[in-house]
């Protein structure tokens, strides 16, 4: 879930967008506006609970500035009652935005987590990390591997940036291969869930790198115009 510029209201000097999204910045991103956004995000999560009868156990998020904004989201809204935990670290993204994972401790135990930085032409990109979190279900003990992505945008042109998005997808594909090869339950790719903002439509050419590994759950909806 891309939370779209979920910055705090302080100018911490952590990225190109940090000054813009601050109380004195061009966006006039004040504390009241920040906490209003927290409320709107929580309302969307509770809508899922109303729609499906249960709150999501796992939420992958993108475009968060730091751990603090997620802590405020969970403490300043009614989400504080539902035991969500945070997995996050600051990335080297030039805008100062990261990916993170929220999970309900009543449903999962965290086994492990790691980060991978995509490379392009042998050089690490100044982009978001790809986050891998291994969770164990408290109901049955099944292991799941969640991978949170926010691939490079089409800024500068779709064709010009395609190589960077392909490199990020190659990194994701390699991570899936590694996880499947060491699956203790012999499930292979079945316990792997990749999520996030891939900055492309579900029929993008780079998704072919995951053929035979993961199921593209958005492709049919996309073809139907949803």
Model-derived features: where do they sit?
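Active-site-proximal beta-strand elements of phosphoester/diester hydrolases
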Residues: 1-5, 26, 112-114, 143-153
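N-terminal, active-site-proximal structural segment of metallo-dependent hydrolase catalytic domains
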Residues: 1-77, 81, 87-91, 97, ...
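Active-site His/acidic residue clusters
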Residues: 14-18, 146-164
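Sec-exported extracytoplasmic/periplasmic mature domains
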Residues: 46-50, 69-79, 107, 174-184, ...
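Structured beta-strand-rich core segments of catalytic domains in phosphoester-bond hydrolases
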Residues: 58, 64-143
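Active-site environment of divalent metal-dependent phosphoester hydrolases
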Residues: 66-68, 94-96, 154-155, 199-205
